[in-house]
């Protein structure tokens, strides 16, 4: 599925139904600014034309992205978790539960980059968001949530 179809068929309907009235900013892979040879538009151009504010992530290095996620996972705010994942984010939860992983070579060594699979795409996007929002890193804490909300413990069966 291309970017335009994804935006129109998936992203816009999701935002309209679940997040109506909220603003949205897209943080994308820095490679998304590269223009296609077919029509000279980039993925970023397509998002902008569809009305989105989009910025490239500060870096796409895996070490910085994983460090940003780790920073959120190991931080607490007012005694509670700083990093919350909505139970509806099943793809992200499944990535966290082992879908996002490093491939083991036949020699027993582990690859230096995560395996590219259906879980890696959602986790890559999540890493870019964490990197952008990381107050200790590149992002300056742009997504720090104000106020508190009720958090319920959930059990997941997949």
Annotate each predicted stretch with a short phrase.
Residues 1-117, 136-137, 149, 155-158:
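Mg2+-dependent endonuclease catalytic cores in nucleic-acid-processing enzymes, primarily RNase H-like
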Residues 116-140:
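Acidic, Mg2+-coordinating catalytic module of metal-dependent nucleases/exonucleases
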